[in-house]
Amino acid sequence: MKLTNVGSFDNIFDFVKHKIGIYQNREKTMETLFELMFSESENTMAEISDGYRIRKFSYGQIKSEISAAAPTLSEQLSDVPLGKMVGIYMSNSINWIKVLWCVIMCGYRPLLMNTSFSDAILEDILKKHDVGAVISDKKQFSVLTVLAEDALKPSDKKLDTREFGTEILFMSSGTTENVKLCAYNGENFFYQICDTYNIITQCPSIATHYKGELKQLALLPFYHVFGFIAVYLWFGFFSRTFVFLKDLNPATIQNTVKKHNVTHFFAVPSVFERVHKAVLSKVKAKDKKSYKKLCRALKISNSLGKANKAFAKSALKEVRENLFGDSICFLISGGGGIDTETLKFFNGIGYHLANGYGMTEIGITSFEKSASPKQLVKGSIGSQFGYTEYKVAEGDRLFVKGRTRASRIFMGDKIINTDYDEWFDTKDIVKVEKGRYYHCGRSDDLIVGANGENLNPVIIEPLLTVENSNGVCLIADESNSPVAIVSVQNCFSVTRLDGIFNAVERAITRANLDSVIKKVVITSESFMDAGEFKVSRKRVRRKYLSGELTTIERSRASEHIQTASVRLEQEIIDIIAEILERDASKVGATDHFFHDLGGTSLDYFMLLDAVRNKYSVEISEATSENLHSAREFYNFIRTTV
């Protein structure tokens, strides 16, 4: 199908080459980036669901609204000296994009604030780096705080002449003591964009359109370097469309992808892994025959190479239809290691899922560009992009250099200006096979065993992961002895807990690690805090050593289950109360959802959805006919999970 949204060209490749050529002949400033990013004024920049309608916003419309709002924001920040950092504390939205460019247009440097960080961490950063103000969609801070809706009010005035802000700053993940701010200027972004032409020529699939359009789901937070560069910058510069979500409910994501014909979405590994696990659980619950049939079809599909698309289109059509439909063209997982079985699942059903690599300090530097499922399922992060160099040294650690790196890094009271000729130590362990790089863990996560050998959690943890658990985290205790911590959430059975202890111990024996790993601990907590992209073993270890991590002793399993069961019933009551907008104290455990509490059919569907998502359970239509009170849901979950 001929594209009509690529300027005067009839294909995306010539359009990309042409636009990069224009950029190469211009100053590498944020002002140039803004002008070029919004130059295809008639192209659709964003789509949102408004009830049953889809609302569309063009690049020209959004550019006009940014220009109209900039004088308003300038007045509100009149006491903030030009050139200062101004924080943006917002979720992904069209308004986030407007605020970003308004801040830059007004002469300030946007600090993209991680909304999952605690107030203490954020306030410490604001104070430490003398941030002038924060634009927020809801939250108030100790510095001047301007609500986004006020900042974006159109003005009849014109913004007085001034230079655009010179850089955008990202927060690295971490604790109060070690959050770094990484600053990217116009030149850094230029080189990230220049990489895209080589990317699409080596990997044409990433430029695939569906029914003449390429639509990127705005799922990854734009405050994260992966979300900003790989989603917003790469696709926004070439005026592709962003689809925004009203919330992050799994059902909303699934429905939005189908409704808008989303073609691309990039996410952290846990998102893809949860989807994979949910699909398998659903098929298993249906019947064993269907599950075996699916596994067999996936194995065949992944063995076919490039021919797998035709096979998957026919044999696995129902799976895709029940998941995201047929519009999906390209997926990237980044931000951590991804389970091989998850790669096999997505590529096996006919979606293209590649593994990628980058860091807050270095930008996005590679992803697997092969079109072959046989290669994609190996989990390689590919080879480096054109403006980046890789080398492996000092214990298989990956070192990176190139002009796509952050121009400077703020660490506490120090500012480190980047020397682009120096190598940056990522501290990531990699192996190289035929020019492709494979991420094998972190050097600072290695545990030195009693025999002097290094234990790599990335290699060992999968060997110890057992059924009915939510993952394993291998850490060192205070004496540097390895401890296998097993996450088991929503468990209401002593038998299940005991079975997990036994299964992990057997797995340790199978891996010949009996003499090395002598302690197994179960926790009811997730290894990742809200908003985290990957497991921080340092944080898990710190919580374990300080006693902050909730652990379950084998001898006290019954006590834990009893406490968890009481909490479960109250959680369900709270869910019902929230859906019906009632005081939880007025909802009885045995109150009938319809007869006593006055719930509607729509309310009940919301309840089923909430319970499914929170407790990862499948509720069939037949089962739901017997679930009408908190107590009935409680009994169902206790016997199912």
PLM regions and their residue ranges:
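Conserved pre-ATP/AMP-binding loop-to-beta segment of ANL
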Residues: 42-44, 153-171, 177-178, 204-215
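Conserved AMP-binding/adenylate-forming
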Residues: 52-57, 72-117, 219, 311-437, 443-446, 460-461
